[in-house]
């Protein structure tokens, strides 16, 4: 540095030149090359310092010029597809999973060695889109011509494929060719097969045996054996499967659902024929006749014998649902019975050899009972079982926590011991290890927005340990898990906040793991995109602490003003503000239109205790709207929110809440878009509407107050987009038709986008148009208004 402060050698040389030297002299000038080099070096150092200063003082997001904005085409492309390896435990040391390339592999958990079971070309050859491996790993069921029916159910044709020989044959009922089945799957032992055709159950002891029809009462649209009708699939079981294997494969429990008194809903199909066709299916609306249900157990070995398991006496003269069935031994099942108002639940333990059932636990509520699908976890001898129950935690109300039930043999008396407590929720019990006397579960103890895997001792001091808290803790705070049959290993599913990964762990030493899927393609794609930054805040509303999540544009600056989009949840009891990885159509809007997206879990949302959840009892539509408006009022106090550019979006129940907010007296929103909106709870499913509002015959005023159609004049000031598929079997197009009829009568302008013959979930072929419609609507509505100055008249020359 001292050299920089001195005159350069070159300067001294110039000054020492002879004074009488002529300017035009031919003699070469005397140059100091060493001095010139030093001068250039100094200039280079100074330039480097300036460049470094610019880089250090420039925000990171501005320096990474390789980042590009996210487009809808990219979002729907392969680069943004998360791969689910669909891992399944075969036994304690074998996991079967599917690679990103479509190969089906077998992983040995002791050696971490993978073996190819099924090449991806097999799926191409047979045009199969679904598969299922036999328990002995010798055969695979391949489903082709798959057609979705409702949310979970589908029909398909099936092939049985020999993995080792390549031999293949069709799976058909006796004397039927080219059959379309409602369900087909392997049993729990060897090559047992079960399939459902025309609402009847068929059984094969192995792939070479003849099929045995287990039921004969099945009738399309009326009697459902082993498979759910719409109501049970969508609102009660949350699955289309309504049958359950005993652990040894010798017995099968199944529901017989009778819809003979249930009114039918008609869904027209407008395209593809000269005259529209229609399909109808039983759909009980609020207050209408419900399906009746019976539970049977059939013995599969020896002469087939079918036995009915009877409901508790209290339900024999009442309407009831069956919400959970589970085998706890080779001969005993545990069953949950729920009354129609959904405020009385009884858990019974049934002996399948005699049909005798004993009551083990009863729950009642002044509102409604949640978590009625939860399966209790039993010890091997059945002397104890574990289940989550609501436990009061001071002024915060009740939270779901683990209780251990000690069963008295040949008696209905039980002893209860609570294993966890606190202002947090146990999400699900995963396993009980009798050797270590530990219970494994997921909970929100670390954060209401996260999910961590914990263990707790069931004896002594009930010590609790977080197993997942230190695993990839910068990237993963939201987990799910699955334990092997003997609990020696577990699969850990990291679902966010960073790109999801799936790993295999040893239970005794969880820090040792094998990475099953890291979604590397998605990670590489994400790194090249200017995706939103998320931030969670806690709002205090009516003595509640409620979470608000904001997604900011990557180059967000607080001095600027931004438009706001508020997104509603699709279901009551859900959770919008989580640590789960999220990239969706709203990510495109944030990136391309510099919009801030807000999600808020107000009263009526889940996983924050029953007090928050059940505030909407008999008040659905009003409490949620009030809290969302309170969140908007908070946001309007922030200097970066443009009060003239506010919008709202919701689908299904979320569309219902968005509509209730838009028609309220609070006029914040410039526009709103609703997809398949529920407009009147009387038109919606019985189990849903009655859970929150009761029976319409007794709660007429409550139903009227909860209807969007009531006092609809409030929608006059907003720009409203309604989107609906005409073949929606969940929220019928009838809801939008009634809404539009009332809008026209009230003189309200609206925009309607209809998707002919599309359901609640828009198909892949229409998805680009669907998202484009929503994005274009919000882009036009939320664009910044530029003030145009009046032009001064030009002066005449």
Curated annotation (Swiss-Prot):
Gene Ontology terms describing biological process: protein localization to plasma membrane; proteolysis; regulation of potassium ion transmembrane transport
Modified residues (Phosphotyrosine): 139, 144
Transmembrane spans: 35-55
Annotated localization: Cell membrane
UniProt keyword terms in alphabetical order: Cell membrane, Glycoprotein, Membrane, Phosphoprotein, Signal-anchor, Transmembrane, Transmembrane helix
Subunit structure: May form oligomers. Interacts with KCND1 and KCND2.
Functional note: Promotes cell surface expression of the potassium channel KCND2. Modulates the activity and gating characteristics of the potassium channel KCND2. Has no dipeptidyl aminopeptidase activity.
Name assigned to this protein: Inactive dipeptidyl peptidase 10
Gene: Dpp10
């Amino acid at each position: 540095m001292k050299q920089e402060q001195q005159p350069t050698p070159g300067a001294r040389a110039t000054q020492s030149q002879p004074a009488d030297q002529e300017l035009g002299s031919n003699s070469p000038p005397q140059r100091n090359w060493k001095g010139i080099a030093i001068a250039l070096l100094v200039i280079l150092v100074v330039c480097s310092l300036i460049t470094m200063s610019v880089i250090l003082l420039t925000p990171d997001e501005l320096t990474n010029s390789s980042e590009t904005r996210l487009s809808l085409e990219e979002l729907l492309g392969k680069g943004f597809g998360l791969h689910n390896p669909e891992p399944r435990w075969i036994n304690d040391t074998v996991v079967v999973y599917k690679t990103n390339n479509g190969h089906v592999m077998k992983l040995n958990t002791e050696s971490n060695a993978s073996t190819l079971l099924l090449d991806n070309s097999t799926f191409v050859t047979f045009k199969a889109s679904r598969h299922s491996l036999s328990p002995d790993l010798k055969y695979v069921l391949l489903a082709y011509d798959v057609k979705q029916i409702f949310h979970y159910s589908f029909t398909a044709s099936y092939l049985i494929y020999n993995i080792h020989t390549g031999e293949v044959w069709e799976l058909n009922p006796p004397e039927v060719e080219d059959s379309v089945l409602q369900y087909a799957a392997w049993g729990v032992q060897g090559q047992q097969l079960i399939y459902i055709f025309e609402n009847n159950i068929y059984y094969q002891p192995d792939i070479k045996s003849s099929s045995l029809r287990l039921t004969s009462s099945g009738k399309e649209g009326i009697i459902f054996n082993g498979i759910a009708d719409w109501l049970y699939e969508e609102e009660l079981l949350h699955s289309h499967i309504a049958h359950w294997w005993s652990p040894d494969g010798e017995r099968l429990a199944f529901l017989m659902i009778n819809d003979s008194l249930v009114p039918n809903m008609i869904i027209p199909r407008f395209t593809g024929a000269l005259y529209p066709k229609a399909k109808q299916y039983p759909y009980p609306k609020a207050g209408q006749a419900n399906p009746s249900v019976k539970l049977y157990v059939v013995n599969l070995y020896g002469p087939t014998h079918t036995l009915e398991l009877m409901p508790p006496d209290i339900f024999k003269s009442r309407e009831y649902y069956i919400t959970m069935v589970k085998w706890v031994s080779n001969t005993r099942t545990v069953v949950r019975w729920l009354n129609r108002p959904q405020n009385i639940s009884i858990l019974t333990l049934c002996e399948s050899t005699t049909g005798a059932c004993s009551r083990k636990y009863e729950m009642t509520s002044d509102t409604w009972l949640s978590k009625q699908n939860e399966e209790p976890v039993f010890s091997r001898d059945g002397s104890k079982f574990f289940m989550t129950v609501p436990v009061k935690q001071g002024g915060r109300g009740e939270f779901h926590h683990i209780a251990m039930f000690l069963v008295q043999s040949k008696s209905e008396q039980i002893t209860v011991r609570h294993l966890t407590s606190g202002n947090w929720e146990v999400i699900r019990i995963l396993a009980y290890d009798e050797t270590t006397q530990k219970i494994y579960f997921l909970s929100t103890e670390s954060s209401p927005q996260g999910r961590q895997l914990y263990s707790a001792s069931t004896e002594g001091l009930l010590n609790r340990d977080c197993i997942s808290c230190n695993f990839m803790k910068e990237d993963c705070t939201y987990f799910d898990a699955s334990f092997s049959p003997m609990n020696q290993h577990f699969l850990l599913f990291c679902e966010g906040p960073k790109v999801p990964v799936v790993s295999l762990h040893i239970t005794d030493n969880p820090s040792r793991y094998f990475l099953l899927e890291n979604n590397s393609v998605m990670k590489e794609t994400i790194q090249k995109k200017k995706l939103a930054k998320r931030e969670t805040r806690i709002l205090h509303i009516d003595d509640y602490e409620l979470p608000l999540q904001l997604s900011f544009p990557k180059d967000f600056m607080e001095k600027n003003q931004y438009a706001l989009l508020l997104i509603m949840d699709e279901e009551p009891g859900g959770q919008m503000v989580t640590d789960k990885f999220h990239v969706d159509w709203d990510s495109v809007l944030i990136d391309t239109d510099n919009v801030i997206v807000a999600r808020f879990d107000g009263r009526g949302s889940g996983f924050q205790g029953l007090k928050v959840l059940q505030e909407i009892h008999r008040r659905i539509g009003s409490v949620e709207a009030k809290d969302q408006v309170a969140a908007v009022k908070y946001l309007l106090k922030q200097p970066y929110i443009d009060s003239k550019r506010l919008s709202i979006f919701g689908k299904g129940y979320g569309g219902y809440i968005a509509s209730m907010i838009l028609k309220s007296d609070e006029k914040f929103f410039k526009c709103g878009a609703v997809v398949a909106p529920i407009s009147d709870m009387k038109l919606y499913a019985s189990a849903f509407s009655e859970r929150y509002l009761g029976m319409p015959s007794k709660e007429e005023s409550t139903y009227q107050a909860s209807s969007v159609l009531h006092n609809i004049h409030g929608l006059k000031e907003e720009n409203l987009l309604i989107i609906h598929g005409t073949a929606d079997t969940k929220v019928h197009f009838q809801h939008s038709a009634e809404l539009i009829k009332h809008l026209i009568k009230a003189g309200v302008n609206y925009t309607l986008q209809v998707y002919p013959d599309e359901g609640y979930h828009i198909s892949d072929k229409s998805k680009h148009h669907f998202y484009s419609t929503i994005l274009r609507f919000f882009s036009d509505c939320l664009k910044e208004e530029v003030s145009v100055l009046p032009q001064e008249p030009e002066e005449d020359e």
